[in-house]
Amino acid sequence: MKSSIDILPDGSITTPKGFKTGAIYAGIKKKSKNNLDLTILYSDTPCVAAGIFTTNKFRAAPVYISEHNLGFPDNRAIVVNSGCANAGTGEAGMADAIEMVKTTAETLNMQPKDVLIASTGVIGHRLPMDKIKESIRLIGLSQRNGHDFARAIMTTDTRSKEIAVRVNIEGFQFYIAGAAKGAGMIHPNMATLLGFITTDASVSKDFLQFALKEAADISFNMITVDGDTSTNDSLFMLANGQAENPTFAGDTEYSLVFQQALNIVCQSLAKSVARDGEGAKRLIEIQVEGAASLEDARLIARAVAGSPLVKTAVHGADPNWGRILAAAGRSGADFDIERVDLYLGESRVLQKGQRTGADEKELSSWLKQVEVIIKLNLNLGEGKSTAWGCDLSAEYVKINADYTT
């Protein structure tokens, strides 16, 4: 079977057929160069939808509503605000989220159950509902507004995060696109910051949920910036079927290509989030192979990527590789240190548990790159995994010390 997956250079959330979006400044965030803080994603036709949500016990109101509405056979729109998380706001916050959904549904001439919702920003503050309801009614939807959607969901992000791919499989073509936000409070667990994915492929609801979970497990669930899991983490996917392909519904060759394309989209967005970590200068990629199991590989990769000591060492270009081993050792994974090989880039600094005498000045110079790859081979089995993180700088402390002031 012939197939191809191509990344489109100027792709956006509205690249797949039938999707439109619009964004506006509603006065939720402080006025800045990015004067957008409210956006709607809309499909011309009903969509099969899937979602994954935060495991944090302190969940925001929009998470509960979206989780409930995803229980219906189809959905058609997502309303998103940035600048206010609508978390820790009690019954009033829940009522605000419901009102946002109702206003969006009325404006788009659909039922509230058709609308999903997400919020991001400061915890503990009420939404300015009069401004939001008025702004929802003013939003103009267009296929051309895809990049505005990615900008409107940003908070402390320094850049928007979006991607689109075109997939060709033996005579038919479809697109998958995505946008995400996140720079701080990034340490997902069976969830993600805020992520939105669209496709014009025809996909069964059960398979869409399965495929999204598979993609999240090797992308959003493998990044960390600061070890904090957000109260609002949500990942959504809408599939409207306008590509008119044979419906992807299970373990077929077509479905495998769909999964590969979705993995590419999710990993690209996840790496963009890690790269844009608050105050970060370097993306850190942790590759673990030769583990006794996949779970052990994931445990080690995430532990090393999230270690404050590893992150600060990378920031200071300090080749203190003992910190990497210490993080691996506390991960809960099983391994024998006398079998471990450790590489910083192409330089092997540890062979079968013994230091190799690699030149530390050369290693320090290499650590000043914008992308740092650290590889551990446990030489035990076939388990392998990759995680992403970023360096930890004084700027991260400054950003978060001043966040609400």
From Swiss-Prot:
Principal place of residence: cytoplasm
Active site location: T192
DNA damage as UniProt keyword: no
Organism: Dehalococcoides mccartyi (strain ATCC BAA-2266 / KCTC 15142 / 195)
Protein name (database record): Arginine biosynthesis bifunctional protein ArgJ
Role, per record: Catalyzes two activities which are involved in the cyclic version of arginine biosynthesis: the synthesis of N-acetylglutamate from glutamate and acetyl-CoA as the acetyl donor, and of ornithine by transacetylation between N(2)-acetylornithine and glutamate.
Pathway(s) of this molecule: Amino-acid biosynthesis; L-arginine biosynthesis; L-ornithine and N-acetyl-L-glutamate from L-glutamate and N(2)-acetyl-L-ornithine (cyclic): step 1/1; Amino-acid biosynthesis; L-arginine biosynthesis; N(2)-acetyl-L-ornithine from L-glutamate: step 1/4
Feature type site, description Cleavage: A191, T192
Record site feature (Involved in the stabilization of negative charge on the oxyanion by the formation of the oxyanion hole), residues: T120, G121
GO cellular component: cytoplasm
GO MF entry, a single one: glutamate N-acetyltransferase activity
Catalytically driven reaction(s): N(2)-acetyl-L-ornithine + L-glutamate = N-acetyl-L-glutamate + L-ornithine; L-glutamate + acetyl-CoA = N-acetyl-L-glutamate + CoA + H(+)
NCBIfam families: ArgJ, PRK05388.1
Gene Ontology biological process terms from the UniProt entry: L-arginine biosynthetic process; ornithine biosynthetic process
